Amino acid sequence: QQDYTGSHMDF
C-alpha cells in the first residue's frame, strides 16, 4: 500500500 502524500509531496 502506497500513500500519495508520503511519496509525492507536491502541494
From Swiss-Prot:
Name assigned to this protein: Caerulein-4.1/4.1Y4
Tissue and organ expression note: Expressed by the skin dorsal glands.
Localization, UniProt: Secreted
PTM sites of type Pyrrolidone carboxylic acid: Q1
Membrane spanning stretches: none
One GO biological process term: defense response
Sulfotyrosine found at: Y4
